[in-house]
Amino acid sequence: MVKYFGDIRPLAGGLKKEEWRHPEPEVGALLRALGKRHEPLEKRLWEGNQLSSTIIILVNGRSIDFLNGIETPLRPDDIVDVFPVEAGG
């Protein structure tokens, strides 16, 4: 399952979450597939071939920054959260 938060939701067609029935082997492949499904989301997710610095991705509540980045492997029952980086002051 993929969950969308904050200003990411409108980019994913207003969805709060969606089931992903075509499991991808790793986070990067999943994000690319989601970007093909939701074109505005793709533009926000990527800066060239790198994940955008304005996005936080969690797999089962753990940041991919502390796992294997976009190469983090996925299992069919994993939950992937897509958050915007919020600026604060």
Language model: regions and residue ranges:
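Ubiquitin-like/PB1-type beta-grasp interaction modules and other compact soluble beta-rich domains
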Residues: 1-88
